[in-house]
Amino acid sequence: MGLPWCLMSLFFCGILQSHASERCDDWGLDTMRQIQVFEDEPARIKCPLFEHFLKYNYSTAHSSGLTLIWYWTRQDRDLEEPINFRLPENRISKEKDVLWFRPTLLNDTGNYTCMLRNTTYCSKVAFPLEVVQKDSCFNSPMRLPVHRLYIEQGIHNITCPNVDGYFPSSVKPSVTWYKGCTEIVNFHNVQPKGMNLSFFIPLVSNNGNYTCVVTYLENGRLFHLTRTMTVKVVGSPKDAVPPHIYSPNDRVVYEKEPGEELVIPCKVYFSFIMDSHNEIWWTIDGKKPDDVPVDITIIESVSYSSTEDETRTQILSIKKVTPEDLKRNYVCHARNAEGEAEQAAKVKQKVIPPRYTVELACGFGATVFLVVVLIVVYHVYWLEMVLFYRAHFGTDETILDGKEYDIYVSYARNAEEEEFVLLTLRGVLENEFGYKLCIFDRDSFPGGIVTDETLSFIQKSRRLLVVLSPNYVLQGTQALLELKAGLENMASRGNINVILVQYKAVKDLKVKELKRAKSVLTVIKWKGEKSKYPQGRFWKQLQVAMPVKKSPRWSSSDKQGLSYSSLKNV
Protein backbone atom coordinates (compact mmCIF):
# COMPACT_ATOMS: atom_id res chain seq x y z
CA MET A 1 0.00 0.00 0.00
CA GLY A 2 2.96 2.35 0.67
CA LEU A 3 4.16 2.43 -2.94
CA PRO A 4 0.77 3.31 -4.51
CA TRP A 5 0.25 6.05 -1.91
CA CYS A 6 3.65 7.54 -2.69
CA LEU A 7 2.91 7.45 -6.40
CA MET A 8 -0.47 9.13 -5.82
CA SER A 9 1.17 11.83 -3.70
CA LEU A 10 3.71 12.54 -6.42
CA PHE A 11 0.92 12.67 -8.99
CA PHE A 12 -1.09 15.07 -6.81
CA CYS A 13 1.92 17.30 -6.27
CA GLY A 14 2.47 17.30 -10.01
CA ILE A 15 -1.09 18.43 -10.58
CA LEU A 16 -0.74 21.22 -8.03
CA GLN A 17 2.53 22.39 -9.57
CA SER A 18 1.15 22.20 -13.10
CA HIS A 19 -1.66 24.49 -12.14
CA ALA A 20 0.38 26.74 -9.91
CA SER A 21 0.92 29.17 -12.73
CA GLU A 22 -2.77 29.14 -13.69
CA ARG A 23 -5.19 31.62 -12.19
CA CYS A 24 -7.18 30.31 -9.16
CA ASP A 25 -9.57 32.27 -6.98
CA ASP A 26 -7.95 31.76 -3.59
CA TRP A 27 -10.17 32.83 -0.68
CA GLY A 28 -7.28 32.31 1.70
CA LEU A 29 -7.47 30.87 5.22
CA ASP A 30 -10.92 31.47 6.68
CA THR A 31 -10.09 31.64 10.40
CA MET A 32 -13.71 32.51 11.18
CA ARG A 33 -14.57 28.99 10.04
CA GLN A 34 -12.21 27.29 12.50
CA ILE A 35 -13.58 23.89 13.43
CA GLN A 36 -12.91 22.33 16.83
CA VAL A 37 -13.62 18.64 17.50
CA PHE A 38 -12.84 16.27 20.33
CA GLU A 39 -10.24 13.56 19.91
CA ASP A 40 -11.56 10.06 19.21
CA GLU A 41 -14.95 11.41 18.09
CA PRO A 42 -16.39 11.58 14.56
CA ALA A 43 -16.20 14.85 12.64
CA ARG A 44 -18.24 15.89 9.61
CA ILE A 45 -16.91 18.94 7.75
CA LYS A 46 -18.54 20.55 4.71
CA CYS A 47 -16.52 22.45 2.17
CA PRO A 48 -17.12 26.16 2.95
CA LEU A 49 -17.07 27.09 -0.76
CA PHE A 50 -20.69 26.03 -1.24
CA GLU A 51 -21.88 27.68 1.98
CA HIS A 52 -20.29 31.13 1.86
CA PHE A 53 -18.28 31.80 -1.29
CA LEU A 54 -20.12 30.33 -4.32
CA LYS A 55 -23.68 30.79 -5.55
CA TYR A 56 -24.20 27.17 -6.64
CA ASN A 57 -24.18 23.89 -4.70
CA TYR A 58 -22.10 20.75 -5.07
CA SER A 59 -24.58 18.93 -7.33
CA THR A 60 -24.68 21.83 -9.79
CA ALA A 61 -20.90 22.13 -9.75
CA HIS A 62 -20.42 18.38 -10.27
CA SER A 63 -22.87 18.25 -13.18
CA SER A 64 -20.97 21.17 -14.75
CA GLY A 65 -17.77 19.11 -14.86
CA LEU A 66 -16.11 20.67 -11.78
CA THR A 67 -14.07 18.40 -9.51
CA LEU A 68 -13.72 18.88 -5.72
CA ILE A 69 -10.20 18.18 -4.48
CA TRP A 70 -9.16 18.00 -0.79
CA TYR A 71 -5.67 18.51 0.62
CA TRP A 72 -4.18 19.73 3.90
CA THR A 73 -1.20 21.31 5.64
CA ARG A 74 -0.08 19.69 8.86
CA GLN A 75 0.23 21.73 12.02
CA ASP A 76 3.49 23.72 12.08
CA ARG A 77 4.22 22.70 8.46
CA ASP A 78 4.16 24.64 5.18
CA LEU A 79 3.96 21.75 2.71
CA GLU A 80 0.55 20.99 1.22
CA GLU A 81 -0.24 17.28 1.18
CA PRO A 82 -3.03 15.15 -0.25
CA ILE A 83 -5.42 13.60 2.26
CA ASN A 84 -4.98 9.85 2.61
CA PHE A 85 -8.40 8.35 1.98
CA ARG A 86 -7.06 4.77 2.15
CA LEU A 87 -6.60 4.47 5.89
CA PRO A 88 -7.85 1.33 7.66
CA GLU A 89 -11.62 1.24 8.25
CA ASN A 90 -11.93 4.34 6.06
CA ARG A 91 -11.08 6.57 9.02
CA ILE A 92 -10.98 9.57 6.66
CA SER A 93 -13.36 9.64 3.71
CA LYS A 94 -15.17 12.09 1.47
CA GLU A 95 -18.82 12.01 0.51
CA LYS A 96 -19.79 14.68 -2.03
CA ASP A 97 -18.80 18.00 -0.40
CA VAL A 98 -18.31 16.50 3.10
CA LEU A 99 -15.02 15.39 4.64
CA TRP A 100 -15.51 12.63 7.27
CA PHE A 101 -13.33 11.56 10.17
CA ARG A 102 -14.40 8.33 11.92
CA PRO A 103 -12.90 9.19 14.38
CA THR A 104 -10.43 12.11 14.68
CA LEU A 105 -6.91 11.85 16.08
CA LEU A 106 -4.76 14.58 17.62
CA ASN A 107 -2.39 14.63 14.63
CA ASP A 108 -5.31 15.48 12.33
CA THR A 109 -4.94 19.11 13.45
CA GLY A 110 -4.02 21.42 10.56
CA ASN A 111 -5.34 23.63 7.76
CA TYR A 112 -7.63 21.87 5.28
CA THR A 113 -8.26 23.14 1.74
CA CYS A 114 -11.11 22.26 -0.62
CA MET A 115 -10.53 23.20 -4.28
CA LEU A 116 -13.21 23.21 -6.99
CA ARG A 117 -11.75 23.22 -10.52
CA ASN A 118 -11.74 22.11 -14.14
CA THR A 119 -9.54 23.09 -17.06
CA THR A 120 -10.89 26.66 -17.17
CA TYR A 121 -11.99 27.45 -13.61
CA CYS A 122 -10.43 27.21 -10.15
CA SER A 123 -11.62 28.32 -6.71
CA LYS A 124 -10.35 27.26 -3.30
CA VAL A 125 -10.59 28.11 0.40
CA ALA A 126 -8.74 26.84 3.47
CA PHE A 127 -10.01 26.48 7.04
CA PRO A 128 -8.35 25.35 10.29
CA LEU A 129 -9.28 22.10 12.05
CA GLU A 130 -8.28 21.68 15.70
CA VAL A 131 -8.54 18.33 17.46
CA VAL A 132 -8.58 18.84 21.25
CA GLN A 133 -8.54 16.56 24.24
CA LYS A 134 -11.25 16.55 26.89
CA ASP A 135 -11.04 15.55 30.54
CA SER A 136 -13.55 13.66 32.65
CA CYS A 137 -15.54 16.86 33.30
CA PHE A 138 -15.68 17.82 29.62
CA ASN A 139 -13.28 20.71 30.14
CA SER A 140 -11.33 21.81 27.09
CA PRO A 141 -10.03 24.95 25.36
CA MET A 142 -13.00 24.90 22.96
CA ARG A 143 -15.02 28.05 22.40
CA LEU A 144 -18.45 27.24 23.79
CA PRO A 145 -21.73 28.45 22.32
CA VAL A 146 -23.88 30.48 24.72
CA HIS A 147 -27.61 30.00 25.29
CA ARG A 148 -29.40 32.79 27.14
CA LEU A 149 -32.61 32.05 29.06
CA TYR A 150 -34.93 34.73 30.43
CA ILE A 151 -35.15 34.60 34.20
CA GLU A 152 -38.37 33.27 35.75
CA GLN A 153 -40.20 33.31 32.45
CA GLY A 154 -41.93 30.13 31.21
CA ILE A 155 -40.31 26.97 29.87
CA HIS A 156 -37.10 27.16 27.84
CA ASN A 157 -35.58 24.34 25.77
CA ILE A 158 -32.05 23.93 24.49
CA THR A 159 -31.10 21.33 21.87
CA CYS A 160 -27.91 19.33 21.57
CA PRO A 161 -26.13 21.21 18.72
CA ASN A 162 -24.21 20.06 15.63
CA VAL A 163 -25.36 16.44 15.52
CA ASP A 164 -27.39 16.55 12.29
CA GLY A 165 -26.07 14.35 9.47
CA TYR A 166 -24.01 12.06 11.67
CA PHE A 167 -26.57 9.25 11.63
CA PRO A 168 -29.73 8.53 9.66
CA SER A 169 -33.14 9.38 11.09
CA SER A 170 -33.85 5.67 11.53
CA VAL A 171 -31.12 5.45 14.19
CA LYS A 172 -32.23 6.33 17.72
CA PRO A 173 -29.13 7.37 19.66
CA SER A 174 -28.91 7.53 23.45
CA VAL A 175 -28.39 11.00 24.93
CA THR A 176 -27.01 11.79 28.40
CA TRP A 177 -27.03 15.34 29.77
CA TYR A 178 -24.59 16.76 32.33
CA LYS A 179 -24.21 20.00 34.24
CA GLY A 180 -20.50 20.33 34.83
CA CYS A 181 -19.49 16.81 35.94
CA THR A 182 -22.92 15.83 37.30
CA GLU A 183 -25.40 13.84 35.28
CA ILE A 184 -28.78 15.58 35.21
CA VAL A 185 -31.14 13.26 37.07
CA ASN A 186 -34.01 14.51 39.26
CA PHE A 187 -32.92 18.15 39.07
CA HIS A 188 -35.30 20.71 40.58
CA ASN A 189 -36.30 22.60 37.46
CA VAL A 190 -34.22 20.95 34.70
CA GLN A 191 -35.42 17.90 32.79
CA PRO A 192 -33.68 16.08 29.88
CA LYS A 193 -35.88 14.86 26.99
CA GLY A 194 -33.69 13.15 24.39
CA MET A 195 -31.90 15.78 22.34
CA ASN A 196 -33.64 18.56 24.30
CA LEU A 197 -33.07 19.92 27.81
CA SER A 198 -36.02 21.76 29.38
CA PHE A 199 -35.76 24.53 32.00
CA PHE A 200 -38.93 25.21 34.00
CA ILE A 201 -38.87 28.87 35.14
CA PRO A 202 -35.09 29.45 34.80
CA LEU A 203 -33.19 30.78 37.82
CA VAL A 204 -29.73 32.29 38.27
CA SER A 205 -28.68 29.01 39.90
CA ASN A 206 -29.10 27.36 36.48
CA ASN A 207 -26.07 29.23 35.12
CA GLY A 208 -23.25 26.92 34.06
CA ASN A 209 -21.86 24.59 31.39
CA TYR A 210 -24.15 21.85 30.08
CA THR A 211 -22.94 18.87 28.04
CA CYS A 212 -24.86 16.36 25.93
CA VAL A 213 -23.19 13.07 25.03
CA VAL A 214 -24.82 11.37 22.01
CA THR A 215 -23.99 7.69 21.51
CA TYR A 216 -24.88 5.86 18.28
CA LEU A 217 -23.94 2.68 16.39
CA GLU A 218 -22.67 2.73 12.79
CA ASN A 219 -21.48 -0.32 10.87
CA GLY A 220 -20.99 -2.20 14.11
CA ARG A 221 -18.87 0.60 15.63
CA LEU A 222 -19.90 2.73 18.63
CA PHE A 223 -19.35 6.47 18.31
CA HIS A 224 -19.77 9.34 20.79
CA LEU A 225 -20.54 12.98 20.06
CA THR A 226 -19.80 15.41 22.91
CA ARG A 227 -21.30 18.90 22.73
CA THR A 228 -20.82 21.47 25.53
CA MET A 229 -22.56 24.83 25.77
CA THR A 230 -22.86 27.62 28.32
CA VAL A 231 -26.26 28.56 29.76
CA LYS A 232 -26.72 32.08 31.13
CA VAL A 233 -29.94 33.21 32.78
CA VAL A 234 -30.51 36.86 31.86
CA GLY A 235 -32.95 39.63 32.67
CA SER A 236 -36.48 39.34 31.37
CA PRO A 237 -37.67 41.52 28.45
CA LYS A 238 -40.43 42.89 30.69
CA ASP A 239 -37.71 44.41 32.89
CA ALA A 240 -36.02 46.19 29.99
CA VAL A 241 -35.76 49.95 30.56
CA PRO A 242 -33.88 52.88 29.04
CA PRO A 243 -30.43 53.65 30.48
CA HIS A 244 -30.30 54.97 34.04
CA ILE A 245 -27.47 57.41 34.83
CA TYR A 246 -26.11 57.04 38.36
CA SER A 247 -23.42 59.68 37.98
CA PRO A 248 -23.21 62.59 37.40
CA ASN A 249 -26.33 63.70 39.27
CA ASP A 250 -27.89 66.81 40.76
CA ARG A 251 -26.68 66.03 44.28
CA VAL A 252 -22.93 66.12 43.56
CA VAL A 253 -21.12 69.35 42.72
CA TYR A 254 -17.53 69.18 41.46
CA GLU A 255 -15.79 72.19 43.01
CA LYS A 256 -12.18 72.63 41.97
CA GLU A 257 -9.49 75.27 42.16
CA PRO A 258 -7.54 76.13 38.99
CA GLY A 259 -4.60 73.76 38.66
CA GLU A 260 -6.32 70.85 40.40
CA GLU A 261 -7.33 67.60 38.69
CA LEU A 262 -10.98 67.33 37.61
CA VAL A 263 -12.38 63.78 37.58
CA ILE A 264 -16.02 63.13 36.63
CA PRO A 265 -17.43 59.60 36.30
CA CYS A 266 -20.23 58.83 33.86
CA LYS A 267 -21.74 55.70 35.42
CA VAL A 268 -24.76 54.16 33.68
CA TYR A 269 -26.93 51.11 34.35
CA PHE A 270 -28.24 49.10 31.37
CA SER A 271 -30.85 46.39 31.88
CA PHE A 272 -30.25 43.26 29.79
CA ILE A 273 -31.76 43.50 26.32
CA MET A 274 -30.98 40.79 23.78
CA ASP A 275 -28.76 42.10 20.94
CA SER A 276 -28.90 45.65 22.29
CA HIS A 277 -25.94 47.91 21.55
CA ASN A 278 -25.23 49.79 24.79
CA GLU A 279 -23.06 52.87 24.60
CA ILE A 280 -22.12 55.92 26.65
CA TRP A 281 -20.21 59.05 25.65
CA TRP A 282 -19.32 62.56 26.83
CA THR A 283 -19.96 65.90 25.20
CA ILE A 284 -18.26 69.13 26.26
CA ASP A 285 -20.14 72.28 25.30
CA GLY A 286 -22.09 70.12 22.86
CA LYS A 287 -18.95 68.79 21.13
CA LYS A 288 -17.04 65.54 21.22
CA PRO A 289 -14.03 65.61 23.58
CA ASP A 290 -11.64 65.29 20.61
CA ASP A 291 -13.04 68.52 19.15
CA VAL A 292 -12.38 70.58 22.30
CA PRO A 293 -8.93 72.18 22.92
CA VAL A 294 -8.59 70.53 26.32
CA ASP A 295 -6.18 67.77 27.40
CA ILE A 296 -8.80 65.15 28.33
CA THR A 297 -8.35 61.50 29.30
CA ILE A 298 -11.31 59.10 29.17
CA ILE A 299 -11.14 55.60 30.67
CA GLU A 300 -14.01 53.14 30.22
CA SER A 301 -14.86 50.02 32.22
CA VAL A 302 -17.75 47.55 32.20
CA SER A 303 -19.14 45.19 34.84
CA TYR A 304 -22.00 42.70 34.69
CA SER A 305 -24.51 41.37 37.19
CA SER A 306 -25.50 37.72 37.52
CA THR A 307 -28.33 38.32 35.01
CA GLU A 308 -26.02 40.23 32.61
CA ASP A 309 -27.36 43.64 33.50
CA GLU A 310 -24.55 45.99 32.60
CA THR A 311 -22.93 48.88 34.45
CA ARG A 312 -20.74 50.91 32.15
CA THR A 313 -18.46 53.70 33.40
CA GLN A 314 -16.53 56.38 31.52
CA ILE A 315 -14.24 58.50 33.69
CA LEU A 316 -13.42 61.92 32.25
CA SER A 317 -10.32 63.55 33.74
CA ILE A 318 -8.47 66.81 33.17
CA LYS A 319 -5.05 66.82 34.84
CA LYS A 320 -4.79 70.56 35.47
CA VAL A 321 -8.09 72.33 35.12
CA THR A 322 -8.23 76.00 34.09
CA PRO A 323 -10.84 78.64 34.99
CA GLU A 324 -12.21 78.30 31.43
CA ASP A 325 -12.55 74.52 31.86
CA LEU A 326 -14.59 75.05 35.03
CA LYS A 327 -17.11 77.09 33.03
CA ARG A 328 -17.72 74.40 30.39
CA ASN A 329 -20.80 72.18 30.15
CA TYR A 330 -19.98 68.48 30.68
CA VAL A 331 -22.81 66.11 29.69
CA CYS A 332 -22.93 62.30 30.02
CA HIS A 333 -25.00 60.50 27.35
CA ALA A 334 -26.25 56.90 27.23
CA ARG A 335 -28.23 54.84 24.73
CA ASN A 336 -29.66 51.32 24.38
CA ALA A 337 -32.47 49.67 22.41
CA GLU A 338 -35.08 51.14 24.78
CA GLY A 339 -34.05 54.78 24.57
CA GLU A 340 -31.54 57.47 25.50
CA ALA A 341 -30.61 59.46 28.61
CA GLU A 342 -28.33 62.36 29.42
CA GLN A 343 -27.19 64.18 32.56
CA ALA A 344 -25.03 67.28 32.96
CA ALA A 345 -22.35 67.43 35.64
CA LYS A 346 -22.36 70.39 38.02
CA VAL A 347 -18.87 71.89 37.79
CA LYS A 348 -17.84 75.19 39.33
CA GLN A 349 -14.79 76.98 40.65
CA LYS A 350 -14.20 76.61 44.35
CA VAL A 351 -14.57 79.82 46.33
CA ILE A 352 -11.50 80.13 48.55
CA PRO A 353 -12.49 81.65 51.91
CA PRO A 354 -10.18 84.32 53.38
CA ARG A 355 -7.55 82.87 55.65
CA TYR A 356 -7.26 84.45 59.10
CA THR A 357 -4.34 82.31 60.22
CA VAL A 358 -2.49 85.04 62.10
CA GLU A 359 -5.65 86.45 63.65
CA LEU A 360 -6.86 83.02 64.72
CA ALA A 361 -3.46 82.13 66.15
CA CYS A 362 -3.30 85.40 68.09
CA GLY A 363 -6.86 85.01 69.34
CA PHE A 364 -6.26 81.43 70.39
CA GLY A 365 -3.01 82.37 72.11
CA ALA A 366 -4.68 85.26 73.95
CA THR A 367 -7.51 82.99 75.06
CA VAL A 368 -5.11 80.36 76.36
CA PHE A 369 -3.06 83.03 78.13
CA LEU A 370 -6.19 84.51 79.72
CA VAL A 371 -7.36 81.10 80.90
CA VAL A 372 -3.94 80.38 82.42
CA VAL A 373 -3.90 83.78 84.14
CA LEU A 374 -7.39 83.23 85.54
CA ILE A 375 -6.41 79.78 86.83
CA VAL A 376 -3.29 81.22 88.49
CA VAL A 377 -5.23 84.16 89.95
CA TYR A 378 -7.92 81.86 91.29
CA HIS A 379 -5.35 79.47 92.75
CA VAL A 380 -3.49 82.31 94.51
CA TYR A 381 -6.37 84.63 95.45
CA TRP A 382 -9.35 82.33 95.85
CA LEU A 383 -9.66 83.19 99.55
CA GLU A 384 -9.74 86.91 98.77
CA MET A 385 -12.35 86.30 96.07
CA VAL A 386 -14.58 84.34 98.46
CA LEU A 387 -14.24 87.01 101.13
CA PHE A 388 -14.99 89.77 98.61
CA TYR A 389 -18.12 87.96 97.49
CA ARG A 390 -19.26 87.38 101.09
CA ALA A 391 -18.65 91.02 101.99
CA HIS A 392 -20.69 92.41 99.09
CA PHE A 393 -23.21 89.72 98.17
CA GLY A 394 -23.34 87.29 101.11
CA THR A 395 -26.48 86.90 103.24
CA ASP A 396 -26.11 87.71 106.95
CA GLU A 397 -26.52 84.39 108.79
CA THR A 398 -27.13 86.04 112.17
CA ILE A 399 -30.50 87.55 111.29
CA LEU A 400 -33.40 85.80 113.07
CA ASP A 401 -31.51 82.53 113.64
CA GLY A 402 -32.05 82.58 117.43
CA LYS A 403 -28.33 82.24 118.21
CA GLU A 404 -26.55 84.35 120.79
CA TYR A 405 -22.92 83.60 119.94
CA ASP A 406 -21.08 83.37 116.65
CA ILE A 407 -18.39 81.00 117.87
CA TYR A 408 -17.93 78.61 120.78
CA VAL A 409 -14.22 78.05 121.38
CA SER A 410 -13.17 74.60 122.61
CA TYR A 411 -9.54 74.22 123.77
CA ALA A 412 -7.35 72.39 126.25
CA ARG A 413 -7.23 74.10 129.65
CA ASN A 414 -3.55 74.96 130.07
CA ALA A 415 -1.62 78.18 130.09
CA GLU A 416 -0.30 78.08 126.50
CA GLU A 417 -3.63 77.24 124.83
CA GLU A 418 -5.49 79.75 127.07
CA GLU A 419 -3.07 82.50 126.06
CA PHE A 420 -3.57 81.63 122.34
CA VAL A 421 -7.36 81.65 122.70
CA LEU A 422 -7.82 84.66 124.98
CA LEU A 423 -5.23 86.95 123.41
CA THR A 424 -4.77 85.90 119.79
CA LEU A 425 -8.08 84.38 118.65
CA ARG A 426 -10.34 86.55 120.76
CA GLY A 427 -8.35 89.70 120.00
CA VAL A 428 -8.69 89.32 116.21
CA LEU A 429 -12.09 87.63 115.90
CA GLU A 430 -13.90 89.98 118.30
CA ASN A 431 -11.96 93.20 117.85
CA GLU A 432 -11.01 92.82 114.16
CA PHE A 433 -13.86 90.93 112.57
CA GLY A 434 -16.63 91.77 115.03
CA TYR A 435 -17.59 88.20 115.92
CA LYS A 436 -19.04 87.35 119.33
CA LEU A 437 -17.11 84.51 120.97
CA CYS A 438 -18.28 82.22 123.75
CA ILE A 439 -15.37 81.18 125.98
CA PHE A 440 -16.60 78.93 128.76
CA ASP A 441 -14.11 80.04 131.42
CA ARG A 442 -14.96 83.65 130.71
CA ASP A 443 -18.70 83.61 130.05
CA SER A 444 -19.99 80.91 132.45
CA PHE A 445 -21.46 81.72 135.86
CA PRO A 446 -19.92 80.25 139.01
CA GLY A 447 -21.76 77.34 140.66
CA GLY A 448 -23.41 76.03 137.51
CA ILE A 449 -23.34 72.45 136.27
CA VAL A 450 -20.49 72.22 133.74
CA THR A 451 -22.14 69.69 131.46
CA ASP A 452 -25.44 71.51 131.20
CA GLU A 453 -23.87 74.90 130.70
CA THR A 454 -21.49 73.51 128.04
CA LEU A 455 -24.34 72.01 126.02
CA SER A 456 -26.37 75.22 126.41
CA PHE A 457 -23.52 77.40 125.17
CA ILE A 458 -22.92 75.12 122.16
CA GLN A 459 -26.60 75.19 121.18
CA LYS A 460 -26.54 78.99 121.33
CA SER A 461 -23.50 79.19 119.00
CA ARG A 462 -23.31 79.16 115.19
CA ARG A 463 -19.85 77.59 114.99
CA LEU A 464 -17.74 75.31 117.20
CA LEU A 465 -14.06 76.23 116.91
CA VAL A 466 -11.83 73.40 118.15
CA VAL A 467 -8.21 74.30 118.96
CA LEU A 468 -6.29 71.05 118.44
CA SER A 469 -3.16 70.26 120.44
CA PRO A 470 -1.64 67.19 122.10
CA ASN A 471 -3.32 68.16 125.40
CA TYR A 472 -6.73 68.30 123.72
CA VAL A 473 -6.95 64.56 123.16
CA LEU A 474 -6.52 63.61 126.83
CA GLN A 475 -9.46 61.50 128.01
CA GLY A 476 -11.95 62.94 130.45
CA THR A 477 -11.30 66.61 129.72
CA GLN A 478 -14.01 69.20 129.24
CA ALA A 479 -12.62 69.85 125.75
CA LEU A 480 -13.59 66.34 124.61
CA LEU A 481 -17.09 66.86 126.04
CA GLU A 482 -17.39 70.03 123.96
CA LEU A 483 -16.15 68.24 120.81
CA LYS A 484 -18.57 65.33 121.18
CA ALA A 485 -21.49 67.67 121.85
CA GLY A 486 -20.66 69.80 118.81
CA LEU A 487 -20.24 66.84 116.45
CA GLU A 488 -23.48 65.26 117.69
CA ASN A 489 -25.33 68.56 117.25
CA MET A 490 -23.92 68.99 113.71
CA ALA A 491 -24.80 65.42 112.72
CA SER A 492 -28.32 65.29 114.19
CA ARG A 493 -29.64 68.83 113.72
CA GLY A 494 -27.23 70.46 111.30
CA ASN A 495 -27.48 73.83 113.06
CA ILE A 496 -23.79 74.16 113.94
CA ASN A 497 -20.59 73.76 111.93
CA VAL A 498 -17.30 72.56 113.42
CA ILE A 499 -14.04 74.40 112.62
CA LEU A 500 -10.74 72.63 113.34
CA VAL A 501 -7.74 74.86 114.09
CA GLN A 502 -4.49 72.96 114.60
CA TYR A 503 -2.48 74.92 117.14
CA LYS A 504 0.09 72.16 117.50
CA ALA A 505 0.50 68.91 115.60
CA VAL A 506 -1.22 65.87 117.07
CA LYS A 507 0.62 62.65 116.12
CA ASP A 508 -1.53 59.92 117.68
CA LEU A 509 -5.27 60.39 117.55
CA LYS A 510 -6.83 57.91 119.95
CA VAL A 511 -10.19 59.70 120.18
CA LYS A 512 -12.46 58.26 117.49
CA GLU A 513 -14.62 61.40 117.29
CA LEU A 514 -11.56 63.50 116.57
CA LYS A 515 -10.31 60.98 114.01
CA ARG A 516 -13.63 61.10 112.19
CA ALA A 517 -13.75 64.90 112.35
CA LYS A 518 -10.25 65.28 110.87
CA SER A 519 -11.11 62.87 108.04
CA VAL A 520 -14.13 64.86 106.84
CA LEU A 521 -13.35 68.46 107.88
CA THR A 522 -10.71 70.89 106.67
CA VAL A 523 -8.02 71.62 109.26
CA ILE A 524 -6.74 75.22 109.46
CA LYS A 525 -3.12 75.18 110.64
CA TRP A 526 -1.53 77.80 112.88
CA LYS A 527 2.09 78.32 111.78
CA GLY A 528 3.38 80.51 114.59
CA GLU A 529 5.02 83.77 113.51
CA LYS A 530 3.94 83.29 109.88
CA SER A 531 0.28 83.29 110.93
CA LYS A 532 0.37 86.39 113.18
CA TYR A 533 0.05 88.85 110.29
CA PRO A 534 -3.71 89.68 110.17
CA GLN A 535 -3.83 89.66 106.37
CA GLY A 536 -2.20 86.24 106.20
CA ARG A 537 -3.64 83.01 104.87
CA PHE A 538 -4.53 81.61 108.30
CA TRP A 539 -6.93 84.43 109.16
CA LYS A 540 -8.47 84.42 105.68
CA GLN A 541 -9.11 80.68 105.90
CA LEU A 542 -10.61 81.15 109.35
CA GLN A 543 -12.78 84.03 108.18
CA VAL A 544 -14.13 81.94 105.28
CA ALA A 545 -15.19 79.27 107.79
CA MET A 546 -16.95 81.84 109.99
CA PRO A 547 -20.63 82.81 109.60
CA VAL A 548 -21.39 85.62 107.15
CA LYS A 549 -22.00 88.74 109.20
CA LYS A 550 -22.23 92.41 108.33
CA SER A 551 -20.06 94.37 110.77
CA PRO A 552 -19.33 98.01 109.87
CA ARG A 553 -17.70 98.55 113.24
CA TRP A 554 -14.20 99.12 111.91
CA SER A 555 -12.81 100.67 108.83
CA SER A 556 -10.22 98.75 106.87
CA SER A 557 -7.33 100.93 108.01
CA ASP A 558 -8.40 100.78 111.67
CA LYS A 559 -8.79 97.03 111.49
CA GLN A 560 -5.37 96.53 110.03
CA GLY A 561 -3.70 98.78 112.58
CA LEU A 562 -5.49 97.27 115.55
CA SER A 563 -4.92 93.72 114.50
CA TYR A 564 -1.27 94.16 113.80
CA SER A 565 -0.59 96.11 117.00
CA SER A 566 -2.57 93.68 119.13
CA LEU A 567 -0.87 90.63 117.63
CA LYS A 568 2.57 92.15 117.94
CA ASN A 569 2.27 92.08 121.67
CA VAL A 570 1.16 88.40 121.80
UniProtKB/Swiss-Prot annotation:
Localization: Membrane
Residues the record marks as carrying a glycan: N57, N107, N111, N118, N157, N196, N209
Tissue: Highly expressed in hypothalamus, in the dentate gyrus of hippocampus, cerebral cortex, cerebellum, liver and lung.
Domain Ig-like C2-type, residue spans: 21-128, 141-230, 243-348
Enzyme Commission code(s) on record: 3.2.2.6
Chief site of localization: membrane
Modified residues (Phosphoserine): S557
Positions annotated as active site in the UniProt record: E482
Residue ranges with Polar residues bias: 553-570
GO CC aspect terms: cell surface; glutamatergic synapse; plasma membrane; protein-containing complex; synapse
Ranges per topology, Extracellular: 21-367
Region of interest called Disordered, as start-end residue ranges on this chain: 550-570
GO molecular function: coreceptor activity; interleukin-1 binding; interleukin-1 receptor activity; interleukin-1 receptor binding; interleukin-33 receptor activity; NAD+ nucleosidase activity, cyclic ADP-ribose generating; protein-macromolecule adaptor activity
Broad class of enzyme this protein falls into: hydrolase
GO BP term, example: interleukin-33-mediated signaling pathway
Cytoplasmic topological segments: 389-570
Membrane topology: Single-pass type I membrane protein
Signal peptide region: 1-20
CDD domains assigned to the protein according to its UniProt record, in alphabetical order: Ig1_IL1R_like, Ig3_IL1RAP
Membrane-spanning segments: 368-388
Keywords per UniProt: Disulfide bond, Glycoprotein, Hydrolase, Immunoglobulin domain, Inflammatory response, Membrane, NAD, Phosphoprotein, Receptor, Repeat, Signal, Transmembrane, Transmembrane helix
Domain notes: The TIR domain mediates NAD(+) hydrolase (NADase) activity. Self-association of TIR domains is required for NADase activity.
Sequence similarity: Belongs to the interleukin-1 receptor family.
Quaternary structure and partners: The interleukin-36 receptor complex is a heterodimer of IL1RL2 and IL1RAP; the association is inhibited by IL36RN. The interleukin-1 receptor complex is a heterodimer of IL1R1 and IL1RAP. Associates with IL1R2 to form a non-signaling interleukin-1 receptor complex. Interacts with IL-33-bound IL1RL1 to form the minimal interleukin-33 signaling complex with a 1:1:1 stoichiometry. Interacts with KIT (independently of stimulation with KITLG/SCF). A mast cell-specific KITLG/SCF-induced interleukin-33 signaling complex contains IL1RL1, IL1RAP, KIT and MYD88.
Role, per record: Coreceptor for IL1RL2 in the IL-36 signaling system. Coreceptor with IL1R1 in the IL-1 signaling system. Associates with IL1R1 bound to IL1B to form the high affinity interleukin-1 receptor complex which mediates interleukin-1-dependent activation of NF-kappa-B and other pathways. Signaling involves the recruitment of adapter molecules such as TOLLIP, MYD88, and IRAK1 or IRAK2 via the respective TIR domains of the receptor/coreceptor subunits. Recruits TOLLIP to the signaling complex.
Annotated protein name in UniProt: Interleukin-1 receptor accessory protein
